[in-house]
Curated annotation (Swiss-Prot):
The keyword Transferase does not apply. It holds the Pfam family PGI. It comes from Halobacterium salinarum (strain ATCC 700922 / JCM 11081 / NRC-1). Its EC number is 5.3.1.9. Belongs to the GPI family. One of its GO terms (cellular component) is cytosol. This is Probable glucose-6-phosphate isomerase. The keyword Cytoplasm applies.
């Protein structure tokens, strides 16, 4: 991953990071790297995510995927990190012949519409819950299982499970002798894309999982004790420094349709990991060039509270723009859609810089397995580094757990929710 933080420095941006402040911050980056390295060496909770390129069993994942490789449709049943990683990998790299869906919400209209539309007899289902107790995942899977039963489909032959050692999902899998992959120990779901949580979906979708993991291993090998020597740390440190100076929003803007879901994955990673103790940078999601026509106005002329992260691949497929008899479009005809999209990228970067909006440019070689594996690993490492600089517990999510527990109690008719003031207008 190659990043350019020049347009985030104070010579261009407001807010911007002074070079001397970046130099001082690099001392903290060195200490943070030592802590991260120690956490990795001890395989500590959370830090173990950065060991996945070494510990993940690609052969076991590939073998599990091969059992349902004949599927025309794949449904991931999970939520949050148990679904976003798979969706990111399949959307970025998956075979176009596979009809892919992530059931990551319990909206009855959506669930029933999906199950009515797909051919369940040629579908594979991957159920993912690290704890095995996730209410939304269990509920959706029970609905899917019932639909397969009603359709006369042997759901046990079409289902793969990833979960922990205990919990209702593990018990169900054991009861019905379902194939089970162990969720990685000590790895929160949002950091588990490069594991049994998401890689099975990628493998079923025809992705070279070995190359994905190799790309992640490249990122692990590139970790170093200075932001000047490590692109992942440079990103995490710059985002942190800008937040400290008022850029409390981080807009992820990929210029590739296949990386649109990556922006969703990034949003969970950044928000759930860093949003604690009254600090954290709020992620926003956009897509270039589409959202130049919806959000760019705000980025350039709205509040000076944003970092814009612009992401693109260095190479793209060819798609020529034909000649036409229309006037005043000579700059288009005979060109290429990729060249047009890259021109939009460059023009947007220049327009943001001209307006003083802090911008970081991120470039990967291509949207291929090795590059995407490196991209995911590097942003995970950037997030861990930022968490060390913020001084937060990067790998927990207590605010989320409160809501989960309250929902369970509400459904069981136990403790009522605390009363809140209402002001209803109809």
């Amino acid at each position: 991953m190659r990043i350019d933080i020049g347009a985030a420095l104070d010579a261009t941006a407001t807010p911007g990071v002074p070079p001397d402040a970046l130099d001082r911050l690099d001392d903290r980056v060195a200490h943070a790297h030592d802590r991260i390295t120690a956490g990795m060496d001890g395989d500590e909770f959370g830090y173990a995510a950065l060991n996945l390129p070494r510990t993940v069993d690609v052969d076991a994942i590939t073998a599990a995927a091969d059992a349902v490789a004949d599927a025309d449709t794949l449904v991931t049943v999970g939520i949050g990190g148990s679904a976003l990683g798979a969706a990111t990998l399949v959307d970025a790299l998956g075979d176009d012949d596979l009809d892919y869906h992530a059931l990551d919400n319990v909206d009855p209209a959506h669930v029933t519409r999906l199950l009515d539309r797909i051919d369940l007899s040629t579908s594979a289902v991957h159920v993912v819950s690290r704890s095995g107790t996730t209410a939304e995942t269990l509920a959706n899977f029970l609905v899917v299982r019932d639909a397969m039963d009603d359709a006369g489909v042997d759901w046990t032959a079409r289902t793969l499970v990833t979960t922990g050692d205990d919990g209702p999902l593990r018990a169900l899998a054991d009861t019905h002798d379902l194939p089970v992959l162990d969720a990685p120990r000590g790895v929160p779901g949002r950091f588990a894309a490069l594991s049994t949580v998401a890689l099975p979906a990628a493998a079923i979708a025809g992705v070279d999982v070995g190359e994905l993991v190799a790309g992640a291993a490249d990122g692990r090998a590139a970790l170093a004790g200075s932001l000047e020597d490590c692109s992942a740390y440079a990103y995490g440190a710059t985002a942190y420094a800008l937040d400290q100076r008022g850029a409390g929003v981080n807009a992820m803007l990929p210029y590739a349709e296949r990386l649109e879901t990556f922006a969703e994955w990034f949003a969970q990673l950044w928000a759930e990991s860093l949003g604690k103790d009254g600090v954290g940078q709020t992620p926003a999601r956009a897509l270039g060039a589409t959202d130049q026509h919806s959000q760019l106005q705000l980025y350039r002329a709205g509040p000076r509270d944003k970092l814009v992260t612009m992401l693109r691949p260095a190479s793209r497929p060819d798609c020529a723009i034909p000649e036409a008899e229309l006037a005043d479009i000579d700059y288009l005809t005979g060109g290429d859609l990729g060249a047009l999209l890259d021109a939009e990228f460059e023009a947007t970067a220049a327009s943001l810089a001209a307006s003083g909006v802090p911008t970081v440019r991120v470039e990967v070689p291509a949207v291929d397995a090795r590059s995407v594996g490196r991209l995911l690993f590097d942003f995970e490492a950037a997030c861990v580094l930022a968490g060390e600089l913020y001084g937060v517990e990067t790998f927990t999510q207590p605010a989320v757990e409160w809501g989960k527990n309250a929902a369970r109690e509400l459904l069981r008719g136990e403790d009522p929710l605390p009363e809140t003031e209402t002001h209803i207008v109809e």
